[in-house]
């Protein structure tokens, strides 16, 4: 009896896997509407399967992915999604590296099989770093106290927590940043309970109190210097307000902000009047790849929140000497200048 059951099972699986091509009654000139829209995008050769869903209603659908002799046919499964098997996907990407995949979607609509115009997915030769770190939080302000910093393997979508705020009194944690994508050298902020900035360098962990009498707030938005010796930060007086009638109910704004640079070795903060003026909101600093230029955004200061809709940020830059920690004497306002 056991042998008969096994034979029946294998026959069923074989029929499902070898259902064969369908007879197409109509070929469309339009590409299918899919979600997410992967048509004509470029992907790295080590990305996890790009599962997608056909937006048009249909009783059944198939997708044929191919590159040269490599071919993969899949049918829609639960929730009308195309779930691409990992092994077949990897074979396709190896074959398509530096080239592209052809994707043809067929659907059974109104008692006939139709074929959409094919689309392509370009495959680069160069792989990407296989890990992505991000903060995960509910998309509303009500549940802000449930959050964590997570990492995801982009090659298979495995996700695990770096730290969750249930470990620290459900406080806010944010602005995690890695030095040149080095997972051994990073920082992030803890707010309210256990308020601090945690600076991690290998096995060394420093807990920093970054509020000073000379700065507006503890350090906020970070950008590592490529040397790892410095981190540029904004310091912000940030507030939240609620609109009565606007569709965007929540407005988060700065009433003041400056830019500073933190020396991780000397534990000192340096700045310049060009980066910390009362007449402007300076924020969002970013070091250039060579570390000799500091980019930042700057807007003329306004009375907030009354004039929130009049704030216009320019993209600016100033030179920075890593050896002396000195800034240039002139700010370049020509990058993107939209303020009055």
Model-derived regions: residue spans:
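Beta-propeller blade signature
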Residues: 150-152, 200-203, 251-265, 311-322
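Short, conserved, GDST-rich strand-edge loop motifs in beta-rich repeat architectures
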Residues: 132-143, 233-254, 296-313
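Low-complexity, Pro/Ser/Thr- and charge-rich linker/hinge segments at domain boundaries
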Residues: 34, 113-141, 214-215
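Conserved small/polar residues in nucleotide/adenosyl-binding loops
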Residues: 336-340
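C-terminal motif of bacterial Sec signal peptides marking the signal peptidase cleavage site
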Residues: 16-17
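Conserved, compact domain cores that house catalytic/ligand-binding motifs in diverse enzymes
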Residues: 133-208
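Residue-level detector of Asp-centered blade-edge/turn motifs that repeat once per structural unit
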Residues: 180-182, 226-227, 289-290
């Amino acid at each position: 009896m056991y042998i008969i059951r096994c034979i029946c099972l294998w026959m069923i699986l074989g029929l499902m896997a070898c259902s064969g091509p369908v007879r197409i009654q109509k070929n469309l000139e339009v590409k299918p509407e899919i979600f997410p829209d992967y048509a004509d995008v470029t992907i790295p050769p080590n990305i996890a399967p790009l599962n997608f869903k056909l937006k048009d209603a249909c009783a059944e659908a198939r997708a044929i992915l191919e590159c040269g002799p490599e071919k993969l046919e899949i049918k829609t499964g639960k929730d009308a999604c195309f779930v691409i098997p990992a092994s077949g996907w990897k074979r396709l990407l190896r074959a398509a590296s530096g080239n592209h995949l052809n994707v043809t979607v067929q659907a059974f609509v109104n008692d006939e099989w139709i074929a959409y115009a094919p689309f392509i997915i370009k495959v680069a030769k160069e792989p990407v770093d296989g890990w992505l770190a991000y903060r995960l939080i509910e998309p509303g302000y009500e549940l802000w106290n449930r959050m964590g910093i997570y990492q995801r393997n982009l090659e298979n979508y495995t996700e695990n927590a770096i730290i969750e705020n249930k470990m620290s009194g459900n406080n806010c944690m944010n602005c995690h940043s890695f030095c040149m994508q080095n997972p051994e050298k990073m920082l992030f902020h803890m707010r309210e309970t256990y308020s601090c900035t945690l600076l991690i360098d290998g096995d060394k962990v420093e807990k920093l109190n970054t509020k000073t009498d000379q700065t507006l707030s503890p350090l906020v938005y970070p950008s590592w210097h490529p040397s790892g010796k410095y981190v540029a930060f904004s310091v912000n007086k940030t507030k939240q307000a609620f609109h009565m009638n606007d569709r965007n109910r929540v407005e988060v704004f700065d009433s003041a902000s400056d830019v500073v640079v933190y020396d991780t070795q000397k534990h000192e903060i340096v700045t310049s009047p060009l980066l910390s003026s009362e007449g402007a909101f300076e924020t969002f600093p970013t070091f250039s790849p060579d570390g000799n230029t500091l980019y930042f955004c700057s807007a003329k200061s306004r009375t907030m929140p009354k004039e929130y809709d009049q704030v216009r940020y320019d993209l600016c830059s100033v030179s920075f000497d890593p050896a002396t920690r000195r800034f240039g004497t002139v700010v370049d306002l020509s990058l993107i200048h939209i303020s009055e």
